[in-house]
Swiss-Prot record:
Protein name as catalogued: Lipid-A-disaccharide synthase
Taxonomic placement: Bacteria, Pseudomonadati, Pseudomonadota, Betaproteobacteria, Burkholderiales
Organism: Bordetella petrii (strain ATCC BAA-461 / DSM 12804 / CCUG 43448)
A molecular-function term among this protein's GO annotations: phospholipid binding
Pathway: Bacterial outer membrane biogenesis; LPS lipid A biosynthesis
KW Cell division (keyword) present: no
Keyword Ubl conjugation among record annotations: no
Task performed by this protein: Condensation of UDP-2,3-diacylglucosamine and 2,3-diacylglucosamine-1-phosphate to form lipid A disaccharide, a precursor of lipid A, a phosphorylated glycolipid that anchors the lipopolysaccharide to the outer membrane of the cell.
């Protein structure tokens, strides 16, 4: 009997992650995967009823503008799967969309798997109640999440992090510099101010002013800034014109110098240290074993929302950056909110660039973390999904 697997991914990271799992699932040619997905999933044999960008939104304003379209897409896939239930449904990240869909399908008798645990350990812990109702089985990327969900009575499997499988245990700085055309002996700083317009608008001026100070200390310092696309590059370069940094290299995926790799990976691999916005990029920097300074700054209105939300819930972890969360320690500096000043960013980043002993300690801790996260994620996830599907058969 063939298996039908419903799946929804709403972000490029989810598309890539799901594509690897689909490849594992479709080793059995009778397995059919369909739903909402991107080009990587389709290349792996996924039948996309709707393209992934139907769910991709950038911020609250964009979400409000696109709400009618999102509701139509949700209604369409829900109707299809209620009329012809899949053997199992897999929601890949995108919790605001997928948890609602998972609840409807599970209540109708379809087993559900949620792949990539919502960051309830960071904020909105109250979502655990909805997760318990909506999800038959959680697949999580971080080891500490397994214990968290198990304590809440939710079946869970730790599958490791796909970035740990994809990023080499021993980065090749010389090869990365050759790809990017950088001097082998230069001191290189990778600057990653985020992938959203709002992040770039707020963080880029602070990061660039810090870079200006660093270049006054070391005029030979080379700054490399990867951007997710041409639009973000244009936004960044408009800010760069106000805070010029001589010799700064701004790269996008279109640049042949990236060598076919994610452009951020080339920048990180080539660097001596990293100044980075809190987010997945901090984990990438850690997997490349680079010392870093993590920063973030919320707008005043977002701060008010977060302050109110935090008053309603349990206290959260003291760390923001993923490397520190995973290591349960301030292994690298975090400069957040009012501490995210150009002066403080420059001072901390200078230490990351020049303190060789600290860099060696950080590299050793990140290497151990990398080993802990390496689990052949795609194979483990595919196996767990099939077990849930067969267990419900």
């Amino acid at each position: 009997m063939s298996l039908s697997i419903g799946m929804v991914a709403g972000e490029p990271s989810g598309d890539l992650l799901a594509s690897r799992v689909i490849a594992g699932l479709r080793r059995d040619e009778t397995v059919q995967c369909q739903g909402i997905g991107g080009p990587a999933m389709q290349a792996a044999g996924f039948d996309a009823w709707h393209p992934m960008h139907a769910l991709t939104v950038f911020g609250y304003v964009d979400a409000l503008k696109r709400l009618p379209s999102l509701l139509r897409t949700y209604g369409d896939v829900k109707r299809r799967w209620l009329a012809s239930p899949p053997s199992v449904f897999v929601g890949v990240d995108a919790p605001d969309f997928n948890l609602k869909l998972e609840l409807a399908l599970r209540q109708a008798g379809t087993p559900t798997v949620h792949f990539v645990g919502p960051s309830i350990w960071a904020w909105r812990y109250e979502r655990i109640h909805k997760i318990r109702e909506a999800v038959s089985h959680m697949l999580v990327l971080f080891p500490f999440e397994e214990e968290l969900y198990r304590k809440e009575g939710i079946p869970v499997t730790y599958v490791g992090h796909p970035l740990a499988d994809a990023i080499p245990m021993q980065p090749d700085r010389a090869a990365a510099r050759q790809r990017l055309g950088l001097d082998a002996d230069a001191r290189v700083l990778a600057i990653l101010p985020g992938s959203r317009s709002s992040e770039i608008r707020i963080l880029a001026p602070r990061f660039l002013q810090a870079a200006q100070q660093l270049q006054r200390r070391d005029p030979g310092l080379v700054c490399v800034v990867p951007m997710v696309n041409a639009q973000r590059r244009a936004e960044f370069e408009a800010i760069l014109a106000q805070y010029p940094v001589p010799g700064l290299r701004c790269l996008t995926a279109e640049d042949a110098a990236s060598g076919g790799l994610p452009v951020a990976w080339s920048a990180l691999e080539a660097s001596n240290a990293v100044l980075v916005a809190s987010g997945t990029a901090t984990l990438e920097a850690a997997l490349f074993k680079r010392p870093m300074v993590i920063s973030y700054y919320l707008s005043p209105w977002m701060r008010r929302i977060m302050a109110w939300k935090s008053g309603q819930q349990r206290p959260y972890l003291p760390w923001v950056g993923l490397p520190n969360v995973l290591l349960r320690d301030f292994a690298v500096p975090e400069l957040l909110q009012d501490d995210a000043t150009p002066d403080k960013l420059a001072e901390a980043t200078w230490a990351a660039l020049t303190d060789d002993a600290q860099a060696a300690r950080v590299e050793a801790r990140f290497a151990a973390m990398h080993r802990d996260l390496t689990r052949d994620t795609a194979t483990l996830a595919a196996r767990a999904i099939l077990e849930v599907a067969h267990g419900a058969a």
